[in-house]
């Protein structure tokens, strides 16, 4: 069984046991989160249910494995011949989750 869920403005195709890095969720480590925005639920050799826009009553349960930050991205601006340089770094926060159950 698989599902397509929306979290953090992005869509992910998930199956039970998958480990994902998603945009930061406000949840503690080792807690469970429910992803309610399910766009599609499919089973092997059975009919696929597509939501309009969401599948009613479908939920995906996941366990939070870790909270962290991604690698640093360096943003460097400069203007030639004008002695203007600006260096800035950014580390995007993420949540590592493991899909436990898909309820359709």
Swiss-Prot record:
Q: Which UniProt keywords apply?
A: Ribonucleoprotein, Ribosomal protein, RNA-binding, rRNA-binding
Q: What InterPro entries does the record tag this protein with?
A: bL21-like, bL21-like_sf, Ribosomal_bL21, Ribosomal_bL21_CS
GO BP, sorted A to Z: translation
PROSITE patterns assigned: RIBOSOMAL_L21 (PS01169)
Fill in the subunit field for this protein.
Answer: Part of the 50S ribosomal subunit. Contacts protein L20.
Q: Which domain of life is it from?
A: Bacteria
Write out the GO cellular component annotations.
cytoplasm; ribonucleoprotein complex; ribosome
Know the name of this protein? Large ribosomal subunit protein bL21
Originating organism: Clostridium botulinum (strain Kyoto / Type A2)
What SUPFAM superfamilies would the database entry show?
L21p-like
Give me the gene this protein comes from: rplU
Per the similarity annotation, which family is this? Belongs to the bacterial ribosomal protein bL21 family.
GO molecular function annotation: rRNA binding; structural constituent of ribosome
| UniProt-listed HAMAP family | Ribosomal_bL21
Record bears the keyword Hydrolase: no
Role according to the record: This protein binds to 23S rRNA in the presence of protein L20.
């Amino acid at each position: 069984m698989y599902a397509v869920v929306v979290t953090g403005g992005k869509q992910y195709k998930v199956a039970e046991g998958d480990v994902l890095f998603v945009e930061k969720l406000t949840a503690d480590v080792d807690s469970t989160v429910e992803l309610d925005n399910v766009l599609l639920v499919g089973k092997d050799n059975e009919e696929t249910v597509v939501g309009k826009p969401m599948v009613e009553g479908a939920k995906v349960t996941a366990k939070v494995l870790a909270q962290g930050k991604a690698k640093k991205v360096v943003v460097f601006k400069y203007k030639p011949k004008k002695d203007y340089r600006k260096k800035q770094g950014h580390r995007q926060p993420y949540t590592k989750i493991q899909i436990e159950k898909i309820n359709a």
